[in-house]
């Protein structure tokens, strides 16, 4: 049974490299039933699937994420879902749709349902290839050269 005093967390992109580790870590911290993993097409690993709730959603279709927010009484979202560079360069419209329209849908849900927190990570890809990788200055100008970098800026 979910604990009402703990955050109720949704992790989009939970089947990805970072999302899967984040989900498992959040489940350890907040309890398995308080963290809902969500993916689109990729089947979850047995560890991810068996350690707590899992839902298939499409962030470009707001109603699929909205159903999960309502059903699980979500108050925090970690929005990890994204189309990465390899696919994004071949399918730029898909990258735009998932990475920007998907983010918009998540932010609108957060506004509508008055969620406590939304985390939307960026990427080193937003800086472009000429930016120093270590100790990147705070005032560095963003010069992304990939669809992924552009849509994560």
What do the predicted segments below correspond to?
Residues 7-29:
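N-terminal Rossmann NAD(P)H-binding glycine-rich loop of SDR-like oxidoreductase domains
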Residues 12, 38, 77-83, 118-124:
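SDR active-site strand-loop-helix element
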Residues 30-43:
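Conserved glycine-rich Rossmann-like NAD(P)H-binding loop of the short-chain dehydrogenase/reductase
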Residues 49-61:
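Rossmann-fold cofactor-recognition segment
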Residues 54, 95-98, 110, 118:
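A hydrophobic alpha-helix adjacent to the NAD(P)-binding/active-site core of NAD(P)-dependent oxidoreductases
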Residues 59-98:
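NAD(P)H-binding glycine-rich loop region in Rossmannoid oxidoreductase-like domains
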Residues 60, 90, 94-105, 142, ...:
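Glycine-rich NAD(P)-binding loop of the Rossmann-fold in SDR/ketoreductase-type enzymes
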Residues 104-147:
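Conserved Rossmann-fold NAD(P)-dependent oxidoreductase catalytic core, especially the SDR/UDP-sugar
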């Amino acid at each position: 049974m979910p604990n009402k005093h703990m955050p109720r967390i949704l992790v989009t992109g939970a089947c990805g490299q970072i999302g899967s580790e984040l989900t498992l870590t959040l489940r350890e911290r907040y309890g398995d039933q308080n963290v809902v993993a969500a993916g689109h097409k990729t089947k979850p690993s047995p560890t991810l699937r068996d350690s707590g709730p899992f839902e298939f959603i499409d962030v470009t279709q707001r109603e699929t994420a909205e159903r999960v927010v309502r059903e699980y009484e979500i108050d925090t979202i970690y929005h990890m879902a994204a189309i990465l560079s390899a696919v994004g360069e071949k399918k730029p419209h898909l990258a735009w749709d998932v990475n920007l329209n998907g983010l918009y849908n998540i932010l609108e849900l957060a506004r509508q349902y008055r969620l406590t927190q939304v985390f939307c990570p960026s990427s080193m890809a937003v800086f472009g290839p000429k930016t120093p990788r270590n100790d990147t200055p705070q005032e560095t100008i963003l010069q992304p050269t990939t669809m992924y970098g552009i849509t994560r800026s």
